[in-house]
């Protein structure tokens, strides 16, 4: 089936407009889509395809056909990306613009519908003072009244979904293409704005995952044409800007997990970048990290992020002040901003918990490998060399003089908690500060962690002073302002969590309301040292003010204190102890002075040896690295070649599958078209899809031909019946017409005569009037003739010369034209003659070539016929030779049979005593049987069976077989059915005579054996068709094959007289029939 003719884009566009004009927009969209996706459109100029594509985008948006638009846009991108990128940007921008316009229109329509509903509800209120009852609320729920959400779902949501699909389609089309990268980034920004404007959290997650996959596949397809290069600084900068926008939107939508993944993406891109990022971007990065860590309650890294943010602000302020950088590339660093950042750095550092208060992790969670990996990841995200701690953050803050820049209440809070902590007055001092912090919305989030830190400090200090303390006393000490009041349950929960983690060792007696601190001097001292299960503990000897030593510390340091006291006593009591120390010191100095030079030389020699070994090691390492690099290059080259080979094979396999699929589609389309033709008409065949799968095109064509034949026969039958009916009708009409022909003829004559008379009168009357008018006109004109003749003569006289001149010019022009025509005619005749001669020559050459080809073909045909004749003659000779061999074999068999027959007759005529009886196995049916005597002279089975049948005496059974007479055969001999002439062996061949009179070789030999002349031979069976069947009586055998007395043959055998020529079986059968 040939493909449909390809139309020009202009014609397709015109046809689409015509379809739109008759309200056939879906058909127009299908037409445009088929034209764009056609393979022939690849060679069409882009300027002609662009209007078609714009109209297709408009129609697809109007009809919400996103899939058709997607297919067409993919095809258009493949066509135009190598020639004109601007047209792709134009079409894609048009697509998104139209989709966004539809969403805006849907929102306006929803607002109008909602406003009309609200206006209707407001005007239909009967009683303004009546309140809503439960019945009215239920009725409003189940009634048709629409709420705002329902209206949006019905009107706005479908278009929002279509716009989201449009963004995703455009991003997928533009991905990993360096020439379309700007449009890709701008589309991603528009998609982020769409998610933020309409609060589409699910779509935002999918969008982030889509962009992440695009970046991951960029390295995979880096070898393709126009692939993006992430090593390009401009490309990487654009991707960073997109990821920062993604981070901002994630934070605005409060999708903290997605925000954290966006931070990881940004960090990965920053590591790839060779160009340092702008300070304003990094400031945004750290600011978003602070919000993410705060939501995740990771106060340690939250404080570290604030510290990095403050450092970046200070650096930006210095860069701007020195004029080394642009102000637009740096974040604003005014004194107010620096003060706010410093306050948050101190406040977040103070909020880091001293101990862990979570309940989900065990005491050893700090040492878990997963936790270490997580801290390592977070440290890398903050671009820090090592994991931060509470003490390190405070030390860094003091080095930057943050106390001087922070707000006063934050500074006082630091002094109360870290410098001058007193458990009995802590709450009174800190309450006004917490009230100020709680008044600020940004700092209000730190009140709860600050309470945890204060409670930790409180219990640490109380454990150093008291062994037992009343719970009410602890509650009185932990008094906070009213919005942040701590209850007893909160205190108990804090104690239980601290005990569970091993950071506190406190027992609670609810009966007496007393808290008991662990006073066992041999217990662990973990409670006395500030620790944190989150990795945020202070360093050993932290900033917590120690009031006194605990008993456990006293016991643990007892030996150290004893050693120091003994040393001091010996120093002051025993002077010799000091003198021995001085002598030992002087001796050591003398030894060092004496061996200083030698040791110096040894050190220098050792240094030279070390340097030499370093050089050798470096040379060996360089050589090893060179070999490894060479091996690596070879391995990479092999992998690259293997990958290229694999890709080539995959391409070939895809091409083969594509061709097979196309062939299957073509065959399927041909079959469907044929089936469609079969289903048209009154005699349509009902062929289902299952039958279609089992039929090929040849079978379908055969079915179609049969159907056409049936239709043709039906039409011919109908025509025959119709013609017969028309003949009968025409015959009936004519019979009826004959009766009325005479009357009709008379009436027709009368009508014709009346019409003739009427026309004649009118013609005479008109002619008479016309004659009178002509005569009158002649009389009028005759009066003017003298004046006309005079005017004509004068005019001819005046213009005679001009007339002659024009006449001569006309004659010359006529002669010139005649000469030109004669010349053209001669040239034409000459050309025709040459053309005719050329045609004759070509025809002559063609005839000669045809004659040569015909002669060559005739010669080849004759050679082929000769070859066939030789092959036929050879086959005939082989066949004749085979026939002669078969005849010879048959004659030999007949001779053997005759010879056996004569021997059998001789043996039968001999007396029984002189010779042994003839065994059944020596008959004409096969080779002679062996006469094997039984052991001890006993008769054989063959000898015993005949004697038992005739009732022989026991004495006769012991006789030898040679002494017994042959049994008499009284039954009728059985006729052989598998042979025509003899009892055993293959059937005898029916050999026909050549002349019908000459005897065969077998007959001649038989005549010689009987002693008679050959002329007395009887006629053969073959002369009369087929001879009589041979019976067992003729062979001397009985029904069971044993030897019996020979019976006379029913018919005498006659010689056939044939020369022994072989006759095939089919000829014998035809001759017999």
Swiss-Prot record:
It comes from the Eukaryota. GO terms for biological process: formation of cytoplasmic translation initiation complex; translation reinitiation. Residues 798-907, 1000-1018, 1031-1045 have a biased composition (Basic and acidic residues). It is found in: Cytoplasm. GO terms for cellular component: cytoplasmic stress granule; eukaryotic 43S preinitiation complex; eukaryotic 48S preinitiation complex; eukaryotic translation initiation factor 3 complex, eIF3e; eukaryotic translation initiation factor 3 complex, eIF3m; multi-eIF complex. One of its GO terms (molecular function) is mRNA binding. Transmembrane segments: none annotated. Residues 798-1073 are annotated as: Disordered. Component of the eukaryotic translation initiation factor 3 (eIF-3) complex. This is Eukaryotic translation initiation factor 3 subunit A. The gene is TIF32.
């Amino acid at each position: 089936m040939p493909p449909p003719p390809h139309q020009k884009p202009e014609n397709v566009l015109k046809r689409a407009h015509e379809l739109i004009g008759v309200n056939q927009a879906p058909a127009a969209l299908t037409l445009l889509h088929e034209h764009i996706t056609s393979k022939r459109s690849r060679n069409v100029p882009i300027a002609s395809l662009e209007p078609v594509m714009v109209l297709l985008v408009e129609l697809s948006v109007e009809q919400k056909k996103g899939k058709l638009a997607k297919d067409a846009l993919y095809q258009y991108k493949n066509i135009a990306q190598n020639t004109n990128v601007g047209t792709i940007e134009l079409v894609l921008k048009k697509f998104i613009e139209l989709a966004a316009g539809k969403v805006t229109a849907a929102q306006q329509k929803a607002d109008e519908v909602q406003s009309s509903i609200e206006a209707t509800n407001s005007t239909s209120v009967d009683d303004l003072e009546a309140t809503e009852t439960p019945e009215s609320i239920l009725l409003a729920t189940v009634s048709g009244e629409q709420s705002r959400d329902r209206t949006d779902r019905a009107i706005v949501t479908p278009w929002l979904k279509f716009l989201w699909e449009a963004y995703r389609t455009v991003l997928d089309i533009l991905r990993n293409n360096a020439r379309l990268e700007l449009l890709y980034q701008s589309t991603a920004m528009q998609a982020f704005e769409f998610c933020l404007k309409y609060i589409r959290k699910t779509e935002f997650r999918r969008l982030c995952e889509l962009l992440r996959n695009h970046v991951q596949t960029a390295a995979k397809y880096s070898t393709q044409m126009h692939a993006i290069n992430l090593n390009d600084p401009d490309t990487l900068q654009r991707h960073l800007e997109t990821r920062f926008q993604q981070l901002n939107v994630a934070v605005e939508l409060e999708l903290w997990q997605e925000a954290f993944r966006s931070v990881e993406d940004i960090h990965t891109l920053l590591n790839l970048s060779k160009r340092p990022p702008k300070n304003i971007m990094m400031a945004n990065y750290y600011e978003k990290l602070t919000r993410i860590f705060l939501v995740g309650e990771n106060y340690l890294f939250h404080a570290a992020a604030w510290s990095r943010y403050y450092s970046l602000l200070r650096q930006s302020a210095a860069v701007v002040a020195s004029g080394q950088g642009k102000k637009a590339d740096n974040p604003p660093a005014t004194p107010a901003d620096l003060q706010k950042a410093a306050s948050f750095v101190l406040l977040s550092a103070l909020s880091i918990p001293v101990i862990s208060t979570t309940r989900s992790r065990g005491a050893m969670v700090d040492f878990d490998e997963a936790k270490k990996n997580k801290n390592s990841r977070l440290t890398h995200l903050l671009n820090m060399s090592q994991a931060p701690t509470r003490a390190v953050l405070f030390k860094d803050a003091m080095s930057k003089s943050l106390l001087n820049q922070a707000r006063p209440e934050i500074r006082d809070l630091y002094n109360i908690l870290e410098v001058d902590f007193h458990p009995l007055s802590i709450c009174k001092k800190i309450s006004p500060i917490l009230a100020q912090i709680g008044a600020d919305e940004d700092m209000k989030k730190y009140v709860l962690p600050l309470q945890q830190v204060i409670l930790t400090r409180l219990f640490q200090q109380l454990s150093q002073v008291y062994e037992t303390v009343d719970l009410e006393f602890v509650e009185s000490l932990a008094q906070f302002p009213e919005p942040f009041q701590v209850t007893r349950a909160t205190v108990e929960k804090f104690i239980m969590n601290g005990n569970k983690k091993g950071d506190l060792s406190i027992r609670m007696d609810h009966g007496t309301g007393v808290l008991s601190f662990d006073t066992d001097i041999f217990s662990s001292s973990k409670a006395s040292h500030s620790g944190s299960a989150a990795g945020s503990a202070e360093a050993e000897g932290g900033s917590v003010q120690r009031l006194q030593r605990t008993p456990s510390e006293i016991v643990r340091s007892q030996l150290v204190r004893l050693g120091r006291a003994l040393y001091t006593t010996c120093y002051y009591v025993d002077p010799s102890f000091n003198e021995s120390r001085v002598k030992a010191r002087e001796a050591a100095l003398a030894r060092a002075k004496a061996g200083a030079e030698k040791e110096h030389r040894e050190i220098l020699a050792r240094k030279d040896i070390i340097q030499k070994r370093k050089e050798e090691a470096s040379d060996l390492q360089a050589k090893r690295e060179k070999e490894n690099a060479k091996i690596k290059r070879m391995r990479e080259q092999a992998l690259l070649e293997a990958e290229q080979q694999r890709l080539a094979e995959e391409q070939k396999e895809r091409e083969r599958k594509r061709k097979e699929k196309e062939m299957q589609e073509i065959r399927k389309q041909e079959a469907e078209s044929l089936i469609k033709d079969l289903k048209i008409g009154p005699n349509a065949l009902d062929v289902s899809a299952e039958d279609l799968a089992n039929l090929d095109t040849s079978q379908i064509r055969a079915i179609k031909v049969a159907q056409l034949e049936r239709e043709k026969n039906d039409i011919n039958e109908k025509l025959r019946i119709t013609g017969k009916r028309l003949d009968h009708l025409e015959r009936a009409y004519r019979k009826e017409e004959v009766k009325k022909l005479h009357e009709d003829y008379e009436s027709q004559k009368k009508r014709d005569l009346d019409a003739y008379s009427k026309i004649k009168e009118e013609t005479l009357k008109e002619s008479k009037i016309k004659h009178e008018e002509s005569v009158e006109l002649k009389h009028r004109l005759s009066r003017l003739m003298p004046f006309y003749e005079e005017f004509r003569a004068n005019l001819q006289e005046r213009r005679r010369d001009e007339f002659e001149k024009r006449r001569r010019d006309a004659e010359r022009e006529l002669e010139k034209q005649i000469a030109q025509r004669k010349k053209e005619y001669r040239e034409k005749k000459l050309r025709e003659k040459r053309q005719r001669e050329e045609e004759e020559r070509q025809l002559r050459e063609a005839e000669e070539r045809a004659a040569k080809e015909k002669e060559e073909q005739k010669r080849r045909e004759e050679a082929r016929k000769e070859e066939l004749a030789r092959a036929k003659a050879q086959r005939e000779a082989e066949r004749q030779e085979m026939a002669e061999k078969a005849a010879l074999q048959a004659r030999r068999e007949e001779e053997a049979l005759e010879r056996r027959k004569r021997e059998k007759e001789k043996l039968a005529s001999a007396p029984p005593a002189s010779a042994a009886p003839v065994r059944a196995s020596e008959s004409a049916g096969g080779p002679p049987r062996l006469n094997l005597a039984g052991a001890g002279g006993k008769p054989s089975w063959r000898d015993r069976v005949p004697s038992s049948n005739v009732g022989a005496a026991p004495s006769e059974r012991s006789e030898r077989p040679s002494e017994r007479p042959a049994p008499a055969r009284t039954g009728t001999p059985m006729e052989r059915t598998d042979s025509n002439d003899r009892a055993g062996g293959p059937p005898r061949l029916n050999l026909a005579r050549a002349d019908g009179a000459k005897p065969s070789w077998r007959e001649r030999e038989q005549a010689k054996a009987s002693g008679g002349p050959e002329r007395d031979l009887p006629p053969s069976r073959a002369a009369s068709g087929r001879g009589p069947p041979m019976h067992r009586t003729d062979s001397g055998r009985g029904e069971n094959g044993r030897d019996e007395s020979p019976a006379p043959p029913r018919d005498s055998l006659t010689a056939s007289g044939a020369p022994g020529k072989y006759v095939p079986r089919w000829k014998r059968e035809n001759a017999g029939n």
